Design a protein with these regions (language model features):
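A mature extracytoplasmic/lumenal domain signature
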Residues: 8-12, 129, 135
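Glycine-rich beta-to-alpha transition loops that act as phosphate-gripper elements at the mouths
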Residues: 7-13, 111-115
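Small-residue-centered hinge/linker elements
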Residues: 1-2, 11, 17-101, 151-154, ...
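Secondary-structure end/capping motifs
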Residues: 87, 91-121
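C-terminal intrinsically disordered, low-complexity extensions immediately downstream
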Residues: 135-155, 160
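Well-ordered beta-strand positions
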Residues: 24-25, 85, 114-115, 129-133
């Protein structure tokens, strides 16, 4: 039974927050932000641009719903309805995930309206458990687990992620 602690040193928005919320303890830097519990499906309609540039697209398909455009290159209402349904399903799953992982009711998650929150706001909404500087967090972890801590640091162009393990815990530190 491994306990997971996550430290957010920058931001954990949307999918990043979904991952952070699985932790038994979510700690955020005083300057950190979390949230954006929502779904966006960006769709770009190039029909007018194509028309101005003299581009006419032709699709040869099998299956009525294979291409989401009508003959003018605009999204069909059926396609838009399917995108909306898909977005709603993903949103409902996301809300349920956060509610379950954070132990808060679904309506409270829905009431966040996909906004982002500073550390203090997130704490008041129970989206996180505590606010600590990185130094305070390391002292907290050392106090909890003593010297029996091993770290693996992975760097990427997105920032740095430090994964620290003990005999019975996993600590994930997300930094920018």
């Amino acid at each position: 039974n491994v306990k997971i602690t996550t430290y957010v040193d920058g931001v954990a928005y949307s999918g990043g927050y979904a991952w952070a919320s699985i932790a038994d303890e979510v700690v955020v830097n005083p300057m950190g932000r979390v949230g954006s519990i929502g779904v966006v499906l960006p769709l770009t309609n190039y029909a007018e641009k194509d028309k101005k540039e003299g581009v006419k697209r032709i699709y040869i398909t099998s299956g009525k719903s294979k291409v989401p455009y009508d003959e003018d290159g605009n999204f069909t209402e059926d396609a838009l309805d399917e995108f909306r349904k898909s977005s709603k399903i993903i949103y409902d799953e996301f809300v349920g995930h956060v509610a379950e992982m954070r132990g808060i009711d679904r309506q409270s998650v829905i009431n966040t309206e996909a906004k982002t929150f500073d550390a203090q706001q997130a704490l008041s909404l129970n989206l996180i458990d505590s606010i600590m500087t990185k130094e305070q967090f390391y002292n907290h972890i050392n106090g909890k687990y003593g010297e029996n801590v091993m770290s693996l640091v992975q760097k990427s162009n997105q920032g740095e992620e430090v994964v620290t393990t003990t005999n019975d815990s996993l600590i994930s530190t997300l930094t920018e």
